[in-house]
Amino acid sequence: MDDVVIIGGGIIGAASAYFLSKEGRKVKVIERDPTYKTASFPLSLGGFRRQFFQKENILLGKFAREFIYQIPNLLKTEKNPNPTASMVTNGYLLMFGPEHADEQYKALENHKVCEAGTKNIKGSELSKVFPYINSEGIETATYTDNQSEGWIDPFMFHSALKSKAIELGAEFIKGEVKSISEIKAKTIISAAGCWTKDLLEDIPVVPQKHTVFRVKCPKYIKEMPLTGDLTTGVYWRPEGGEYLAGSPNSVFDATDLEPAWNDFEELVWPALAQRIPAFEELKLTGGWAGYYDCNKLDNNAVVGKHPKFDNVYMASGFTGRGLMQAPGIGRALTEIITTGSYQTIDISDFAVERVLGNNARPEPYVL
C-alpha cells in the first residue's frame, strides 16, 4: 500500500507533494496529462496578491509572497541550482464603485488585522497617483507599492516545485483516476481542480472558462500594476511591450477552451478605453482561454478531510487563486495530515463540511 497518493499534478498537487516530501512522507502523484495543456495554472495571469475580503485568503496571499521570494533557496536542486519564477512586483490596484464601497471598507479592517500592507485611496484622488486612469465612477481603491504583490511565470513556478518534490523523493506518474476507490493508500489527496466532481460528486466545483486577450497599445506603461476594475470585472497587466486583459464573462461547465473572441469588442475594449483613455487605440494581437476550478457555493477554496472517507483529503475550488494559494495550501494539508490540525494559517472554515452543509462564506474579490 502506498503512503500518500495525490490525484492531480497541477500547482496544488505539486505544492502538496513538495511539503509532504519535506516531512519524509512517500508521495506518489498521478497526473493524466503531464503536458498540463488544459490545466488551470499555465493559462492564468500568474498573479499573487493579499487583497481579499476573507482573512484566510489574505494570509495565504502573504505566505505566497514569502515563499516566492525564497524560491532560489527553497527549491534549488542539483539539476537546477538557480530556480526562479520570474517575479514582477508591480503590485495590484483594485478599484470599486459606490455599490461595493461598504463591503470594501469592511475588507480594509481585515487587511489591517492581517497586516496586509495595502493602501486605500479615494476615487477622487486616484488620478493623482495613477494619472493615466479615468476615475469616473470609482468610489475607492486599494493598492500596494511595497513589492508585496505582482505576478510570476506559472509554468516556471510549477516546474521548480515539481523538480524539488522529485528530488525529495516524490514520484510523478502518468495515469487517470476514475474513482477514489481505485486508490490503495494510507492517505489520498484529491487535487483534481476543475474535474473534482468526477471523483467527489458532492463537491460543487466545476470548470469555469475565462478568456484572456493580448493587446497592443502605442502607450506602454511597464510599471503599471495588475489592475482590476470591479465596476466592470475587467482586469489587465503589462506583459512584454503589450497588455494582457481578462474578460468578466465566464462559462460554467465548459468543455472547450475556445476563447470568447466577441467579448473583446463587446465588453473588454469598451471597459478598458473608458478607464484608461490611451486604451482607445488598442489592437487585439491574440488571446487564450483557461479554466478556473470554481466553487459555485461561495468562490472560496474547499480544503481538508472529506467526512465520508477515513483517509481522503481534498483541495480545490480556488476560483482563480490556485497559483497564489498553492504554497499555503500545500503546507496546510501537510500540517493537518501529519499533526491532525493546522499549525500556521487556520483554514478550518474552508472545510469540506462547509459546502456539504451549504454554508457559504463568500469571497467577493474575484477577478
Where do the protein language model's features map onto the residues?
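C-terminal catalytic lobe of FAD-dependent flavoproteins
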Residues: I276-L367
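Flavin (FAD/FMN) cofactor-binding and adjacent substrate-gating region
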Residues: Q70, M95-L168, I173-K174, N295
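Active-site lid/adjacent beta-loop-alpha segment flanking the redox-cofactor pocket in flavoenzymes
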Residues: C217-N311
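Short hydrophobic core segments
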Residues: V5-I7, I183-C194, G330
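N-terminal Rossmann-like FAD-binding beta1-loop-alpha1 element of flavoenzymes
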Residues: D2-K28
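Glycine-rich FAD pyrophosphate-binding loop
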Residues: K22-F41
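Central helical "cap/lid" subdomain
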Residues: K37, K186-P225
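Dinucleotide-binding Rossmann-like beta1-alpha1 core, especially the glycine-rich loop
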Residues: L45-V129, G233-V234, L272-A273
